[in-house]
Structure formats: structure tokens, C-alpha cells
């Protein structure tokens, strides 16, 4: 998989060189490239924004600069992802779907966003998805891009040491979209708090039933919108 990220703050993407994403890059499982949008500017000030038509606060990122950048980086096989609080909600299912893509490009906006014509123009040549990571607003799309890239990479074969590690994660299909229950490790007793007895029993059927029940309970309490009929 190839991933390109376009931004005016390349250093914001440095966390992707660490931990599991970093290992995926080093091992060749993913080809990650971060591009400074200002490279495609032509004025002495390297301007990437201008005042919005119709008035209003803030600045809007200019279409010509973004157009040149995407023309050079993208192809008809690209899935262009535009992080925006006005986008469709990013979920585990989204991350899973993107693992089948060969080329992801993230266009990280700033200020009041990117001129909408950039999205419209790109959609004539490739697939485009405007995506939000939650009902809140960030200064730019870089943090959202890091979140989404990490979510996708950990699902790629060979990234996690144990391929089964993500199969029973919260929101995963292996858990029917529910929240994962609590985890425990040694010691069995700590500061007067004991690990649930069932987890020490060695009875795999009982353990599976217990995990299912606490998963359902946690989901009902914390995310009733995800509640499961059983």
C-alpha cells in the first residue's frame, strides 16, 4: 500500500514514523510519503490561502495550489481522503475497507478548509471521500490523518505480531461491533482488587461467555447506540 499525505505542516505527521506504523514503513509493508503543499506555490510568499467569497471569518485554501499537488500525486486508482468535520463518520468498518486500497492520499486542510472545487475536480478523475473522525473541530486535518492511517495500518497483514490481535477489538466484526471488555494481567490480586475468578478458571467456554456478557454490558452503558439485541 502507498500512502501520500499533503499538508502545510509536515512535522505534524512525524508520529507515523514511530511504533507500529514506523515498523510497517521500515519493513516495506507501506510506502508513506508526506508532502509540503507549499512546494506547489509560485509566488514569493508561498501563499496557500485567500479570503472566502461571500465574506466571513478566516481564510480558505486555494484551489490552484491543491489542484497542482493532486495532479502530480494522484492517479485514477487513488482514493483521495479529505479529513473534515463536515464529512462522513470514520469507523472501524471504514478502516477495514481501506485496507484493500493500493493508494490512499490524504488532503489535510487548514483554516476554514479547502476550496470545495478541489473536491469536485478530483472527483472527476478519482474516488473521493470526505471523512470526519468525530463531532468536534481540530485546527487542521493532520491529526485526523494520523488517526485514520494508524487505524488502517494495524489491520494490514504483517503489521501486528499476532494477526488475531485486532479480531476482537472494540467495533470489530469479530465482536459484532460491540465494545471490548476489560483486560487483566498478573498479579491476580492488587491493592485489594482481584481479577474476576472466571478468568483464572481455565474453562474456555465460561471465559468466552463472561467476555461476551461484559462486552454487552459495557456497550449498553457506554454506547447504547451500538447495543446488540442479545
From Swiss-Prot:
Its main location: cytoplasm. Gene3D superfamilies: 3.40.1280.10, tRNA(m1g37)methyltransferase, domain 2. It is an enzyme of class 2 (transferase). One of its GO terms (molecular function) is tRNA (guanine(37)-N1)-methyltransferase activity. One of its GO terms (cellular component) is cytosol. One of its GO terms (biological process) is tRNA N1-guanine methylation. S-adenosyl-L-methionine binds at residues 109, 133-138. Its EC number is 2.1.1.228. Keywords: Cytoplasm, Methyltransferase, S-adenosyl-L-methionine, Transferase, tRNA processing. It comes from the Bacteria. InterPro entries: Alpha/beta_knot_MTases, tRNA_m1G_MeTrfase_C_sf, tRNA_m1G_MeTrfase_TrmD, tRNA_m1G_MTases_N, tRNA_MeTrfase_TRMD/TRM10. It is found in: Cytoplasm. NCBIfam families: PRK00026.1, trmD. Was identified as a high-confidence drug target. Specifically methylates guanosine-37 in various tRNAs. Belongs to the RNA methyltransferase TrmD family. Homodimer. This is tRNA (guanine-N(1)-)-methyltransferase.
